[in-house]
């Protein structure tokens, strides 16, 4: 678990912000399903990355895998299926990993799951500039909160997030919306852009 403050988590301190755009229901459903799935496995997990693919196309292309996942006979038109990717080295920050990824055209979207320590806005001025010192500061601060963040996006530009505090570890307390973690959302969206010479295809 990476232990440093992350920009964009402040909405956990209050009510869910008003959405500037209506969410994509297929993406929202996929993100919430991933959050619930990861949530059942507990805390202190490494970051996880999922490709999102059109369910009907996935069933047609990979019928055996779809059947093993229990979706071959329950296809909802327009829905997205999350397919977990291989884990990368735990010592490599997820932000760096996302900067190297370019998805193939068959992938319609993606989402990433990370755990972070976050602090309330009133202590921002006290956070050291040095990353190592900032991590120690967050880890030892009495007002720290552990939060799981799921950020997803599609090639069409839709985004959706789900956040869960360890202190309120139940599905009813999950906060969701289109842009709750802007920095992470931007990195996820960037993986869906056209490939360039520096990208590594997932």
How does the language model describe each region?
Residues 48-52, 80-82, 108-118, 146-153, ...:
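Ordered hydrophobic segments in well-structured contexts
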Residues 48, 58, 69-70, 106-111, ...:
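A contiguous, surface-oriented mixed alpha/beta subdomain in the mid-to-C-terminal portion of proteins
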Residues 79-145:
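Internal, well-folded beta-alpha domain core
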Residues 1-31, 39, 67-71, 193-202:
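Actinobacteria-biased recognition of intrinsically disordered, low-complexity terminal regions
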Residues 33-87:
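N-terminal interaction modules that seed assembly of large macromolecular complexes
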Residues 121-202:
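Glycine-rich, aromatic-bearing surface loops/beta-hairpins
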């Amino acid at each position: 678990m990476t232990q440093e403050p992350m920009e964009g988590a402040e909405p956990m301190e209050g009510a869910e912000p008003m959405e500037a755009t209506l969410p994509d229901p297929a993406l929202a459903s996929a993100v919430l399903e991933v959050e619930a799935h990861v949530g059942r496995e507990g805390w202190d997990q490494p970051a996880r990355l999922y490709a999102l693919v059109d369910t009907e196309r996935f069933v047609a292309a990979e019928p055996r895998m779809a059947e093993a996942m229990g979706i071959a006979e329950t296809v909802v038109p327009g829905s997205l299926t999350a397919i977990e990717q291989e884990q990368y080295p735990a010592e490599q920050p997820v932000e760096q990993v996302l900067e190297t990824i370019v998805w193939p055209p068959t992938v319609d979207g993606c989402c990433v799951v990370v755990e972070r320590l976050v602090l309330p806005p009133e202590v921002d001025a006290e956070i050291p500039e040095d990353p190592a010192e900032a991590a120690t500061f967050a880890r030892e601060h009495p007002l720290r909160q552990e939060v799981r963040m799921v950020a997803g996006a599609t090639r069409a530009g839709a985004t959706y997030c789900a956040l869960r505090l360890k202190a309120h570890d139940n599905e009813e307390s999950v906060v969701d919306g289109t842009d709750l973690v802007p920095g992470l959302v931007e990195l996820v969206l960037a993986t869906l852009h056209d490939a360039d010479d520096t990208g590594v295809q997932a």
